UniProtKB/Swiss-Prot annotation:
Record family assignment: Belongs to the enhancer of polycomb family.
Lineage: Eukaryota, Fungi, Dikarya, Ascomycota, Pezizomycotina
UniProt-listed InterPro entries: Enhancer_polycomb (IPR024943), Enhancer_polycomb-like_N (IPR019542)
Region entry Disordered, spans: 541-570
Intracellular or extracellular location(s): Nucleus
Subunit record text: Component of the NuA4 histone acetyltransferase complex.
Keywords: Cell cycle, DNA damage, DNA repair, Nucleus, Transcription, Transcription regulation
Protein name from the UniProt record: Enhancer of polycomb-like protein 1
Gene name in the database record: epl1
Amino acid sequence: MTRYAGLGRTRPKKLTPKAPIPIYREHQIDDLEEEIQNGLQQVETGVEKAEESEYHLQVAINAVASGRVVNEAHIPTPETVLSNLQYDELYPPVFSQPATYIRFSSTVEDCCGCPYNMTDEDDVFLKIMNEKRDPADRCTEDQFEEVMNFFEETVRLKQPYAAVGSAPVLSFAEMQESMDATVEDYVRRLAKDVYDHWKTRRLNNGNQSLLPSLKFETGAETDDTDPYVCFRRREVRQVRKTRGRDAQSADKLRRLRKELEDARQLVALVRQRELARKEMLATERILFLQRAEVKDMKRKLNIKDDDEDLINQKPKKKPIEAPPMQRPAAAQLRMPPKPGAQAAEDLQLLEDVQAEKENEIIRDIKANIAKHMKWNEGYVDFTRAPLSPSPERTVDISFRPAITTQLPTPPSSDSSENTPDLALDMSGTVSYRDKLDEHALIMSEDANKMPSFRRRIGRGGRLLIDRRNFASRCRVELDPWKADRFKYDQEDSDEDLDYEMDQYDISLMQNRAIMLAKARDQAHAQAQAAQVRRLQAEQAALNNLNSGQTSGQTMGSNPGPGAIAPTPET
């Protein structure tokens, strides 16, 4: 259980292109199980993942896990001191406090000297080379380092990425081209002998620099486990792009483009202006030379004439003659108008401009309506509020007076004995009266006061006839209650008229709010009045009860003079 506990608490790392993935064959299954067991033991080692595969660390961990006794294992480390020289004896600590910390004004580069340091190979080559040369012309170690440094600096300037690609090593001719006045004479003299040695070392080093430098990442897989790689790249989190960020970037680019276009246009205009000035100067120069030739020719031919044509004459302005009997206008400080300028137009009023715009809009609307009606010829537009409504059959809904020429029988509601004698006139209209006789309705011979009827079509194609009775006139002696009974003596139509209205109209909403407020106030007032009446009734009942008790006590006993009446209990 202990071995598998660490595996459950460890998250598997994501696969990366840099991590090698092993491939196992069928005959490697047993070894695979052993490696899995070893991996379970290596989960909690306390060191970094890249250092868990160290040999001595694995030996120590496996020994502890198996419980067997082995020799003490240790991780070897290199010695910090490479030689047995005692620097304290060679350099005695003799130090004197300086008067000032600044002892010289040389720069750090001047004090460092040559950055190239000789190696054992260089020392062997230098000794062999000096044996072949004269004692007076031998090369010292400092001179050798200067020559090697010159080669390295030249390659760094001409081939900065020589180590990345497969660039060839610079030839000696290219090295000689780089020798300028700053190069010492001994470098020129010893360069040819040292070049072959430098080229050999450069090729052995993979055409990389021989100077000690910091080691950076090269993109190889060994960079992750190489402890000497400095300034490692880290995984930079990708910036999350949003539409707002894209819009801001687009606005910035658009603004920058506009500024650049404006600057470019200004530069183009300035260039055009300068070219025009240059052309004008050239024209003036040609004109001046031609005038000089004309002047010389006049002198040779002895032509006596004015030289006005040789001078640029400005046209004189014609004076404006003021009309007679007119007061001269006051002097105005205005710029003189240009010769090609147009005359100023009359100032237009804002009302005129707005009226013109409105008239133009109305004309456009009428033109569009006429065009739409022309398009819809022969068609019926059933859309809502059409521009060209379909012609509907007009129905005369007005009432028409009923003119009777004959009444063969009296009304069925009248009895025979009470019916007055009616003279039937076949040639004219018949006038008749009801039971009220002269006290009720008086019919007029005017056609406008005659009974009228109206015909209309209801639902389902039913034919309906509405009637309008005589106009009644109430006399003084007629009871108003009796006259009012005929006010609504008419039949209701079968078809109820629906009045469409917007229930969300402001006026209707205000009306409903006012009516609801009034109803609420009335209900509140009624409740208060009912409560007051209830309190008054309770108070009256209590007063009646108290008065009855007082009268009973008075009738039961007859107190003498000076007696005190009992106080009523409340």
